[in-house]
Amino acid sequence: MKILFGVQGTGNGHISRCRTLAKALKKAGADVDYILSGRDPKDYFDMQAFGNYRTFGGLSFATLNGKINFRKTIQRIRAFRLIKDVRDLDLSAYDCIISDFEPVSAWAAHHQNRECLGISNQSVCQYLKPKEYGTIANVIMKYYAPVTQPIGLHWFHFGHKLIPPMIDSFATPPTEDGKIIVYLPFEDLTEITELLSQFPQYQFSCFHPEIKQSSARGNILLQPLSRDNFTQALLSCSGIISNTGFALISEALSLGKKILTKPVAGQFEQVYNAQCLQSLDMATVMEHLNSMKLKYWLGLPSPKPTIYPDVATELANWIVSGQKETLLSLSQRLWSQTKFPSNVSERIKSLGYV
């Protein structure tokens, strides 16, 4: 099967998830071409899984001090370039089109009257229509990267045909060394370090795109972005402080790491993700960098891990086999293999789900 896979490049979480699915698709025998959009080509890293991928400008949201900056977002849109990229992308050689919230591949499929699978956390809004999004946000989420078959990834199904998160396997089992990982790429680095320095009895490993070389600042180890170094730190940490992107939170849940999360203000997906995590008793949420909330969270024990099945392999086989099984059946089968910690199971029951 020949597949075109469009990957949203603005967040490392999208790339991480698609990297996991890329390995599974290759193992399933698929021949896949990848396109990425939304980021300067020089800013991609650890991209071996995508082979000779192509890049496009696409669409992306600009942030400032942890909030969506709509003025800068509008300024960076190159509408004529996007339209040209969509019209020039020939899909005739492909049996299947997949988009992980990537607009060029999705709109090209729409323009050429092709079916398109939308595999992303954002596809959840096609089913749940979150009130946190509002009417305008739901319209944006629907038409940013339109697909014919939305496949929503989520931490729980909420009574819909969603599927669990795709999580890569780890080479070693998780441990706890007492350190706390901090990954808040959309927040001001100075504000982050000022907050962490108020807790000298704890050791923090802070990864941030502004950091170009490793260094120590009191109780804070400042580290540049590196997938391998971050993964090693995640496996051994005693907790993680992050924005509310789907992929990293999913990994932390599967490893049994306690989570303190701050959604990027104005980023609809993250605001809704935070609300879901709170309602499921899976994480602690703060709306802004908050020393009182951090102090409370540091005193919490580590949770038990959430055990999700090998979703990437199941999904890859489902795609390559021609999607003969219904999405509802696939969803039910995957959730039947999912095991939640007792506190989460109790919360799910209290919400009316069995």
Predicted region positions:
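A short, glycine/small-residue-rich beta-strand->loop->alpha-helix junction that serves as a flexible
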Residues: 7-19
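Conserved nucleotide-sugar phosphate-binding/catalytic loop shared by glycosyltransferases and other
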Residues: 9-12, 27-80
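Donor-nucleotide binding loops and adjacent catalytic segments primarily
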Residues: 22, 166-239
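Conserved nucleotide-sugar donor-binding subdomain of glycosyltransferases
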Residues: 67-96, 101-104
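A donor-sugar binding/catalytic signature common to diverse glycosyltransferases
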Residues: 97-103, 108, 233-272
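A nucleotide-sugar donor-handling region in carbohydrate enzymes
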Residues: 126-189, 206-210
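Catalytic binding pocket for nucleotide-activated donors in carbohydrate/polymer assembly enzymes
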Residues: 249, 253-303
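C-terminal amphipathic helix plus adjacent low-complexity
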Residues: 295-354
